[in-house]
Amino acid sequence: MKLLHIDSSILGDNSASRQLSHSVVEAWKAAHPATVVTYRDLANDAISHFSAATLVAAGTAAELRDAAQKHEAQLSAQALAEFKAADTVVVAAPMYNFTIPTQLKAWIDRIAVAGETFRYTEAGPQGLCGGKKVIVVSTSGGLHVGQATGVAHEDYLKVLFGFFGITDVEFVRAHGLAYGEEVRSKAMSDAQAQISQQLFAAA
């Protein structure tokens, strides 16, 4: 079994989403000891944003690419291959300015590829990644679930993975982290309890 672990917070060791995503992965490994983990730190090893250079590289035959185009093509190919190979994907998605970090969006743009993770048919779009499990670690300073301010965060990720054909999407939440130490502590404690007591109860 293969697990892809994605971190995207810029806060390093001070990051709540990193702490919780690592707890999720450790709990998963305890339940599935044979799991092989691939780790991507999108903040410390950022993927360049989707650009005209990305499109040109994709449209240029491999033998004709220059060094920059080869680099762009390799970034896309590796990110896509890791995602497609994974049975389970753990995505740490802190909220920055009502949406996901720009580093996470850059990764998404490398894996959202027609003919690879989805395709268009006469009946409409069809996801090609059914059967995967996605666990999203959702953190935020405020309380946004069910609010208009949360649409570009959790709702966006639900739509995205659903578009890929993934229906097994779970959220581990620690919200209200900026509402004082007591609220933060409870939010983190509740999230850790969900991970240890509920998330893999059926495993």
Curated annotation (Swiss-Prot):
It is an enzyme of class 1 (oxidoreductase). This is FMN-dependent NADH:quinone oxidoreductase 5. FMN binds at residues 9, 15-17, 95-98, 139-142. The keyword rRNA-binding does not apply. Belongs to the azoreductase type 1 family. Pfam families: Flavodoxin_2 (PF02525). Quinone reductase that provides resistance to thiol-specific stress caused by electrophilic quinones. Also exhibits azoreductase activity. Catalyzes the reductive cleavage of the azo bond in aromatic azo compounds to the corresponding amines. Keywords: Flavoprotein, FMN, NAD, Oxidoreductase. It catalyses: 2 a quinone + NADH + H(+) = 2 a 1,4-benzosemiquinone + NAD(+); N,N-dimethyl-1,4-phenylenediamine + anthranilate + 2 NAD(+) = 2-(4-dimethylaminophenyl)diazenylbenzoate + 2 NADH + 2 H(+). Binds 1 FMN per subunit. It comes from Pseudomonas fluorescens (strain ATCC BAA-477 / NRRL B-23932 / Pf-5). Its cofactor is FMN. Homodimer. One of its GO terms (molecular function) is FMN binding. InterPro entries: Flavodoxin_fold, Flavoprotein-like_sf, FMN-dep_NADH:Q_OxRdtase_AzoR1, NADH:quinone_OxRdtase_FMN_depd. It comes from the Bacteria. Its EC number is 1.6.5.-, 1.7.1.17.
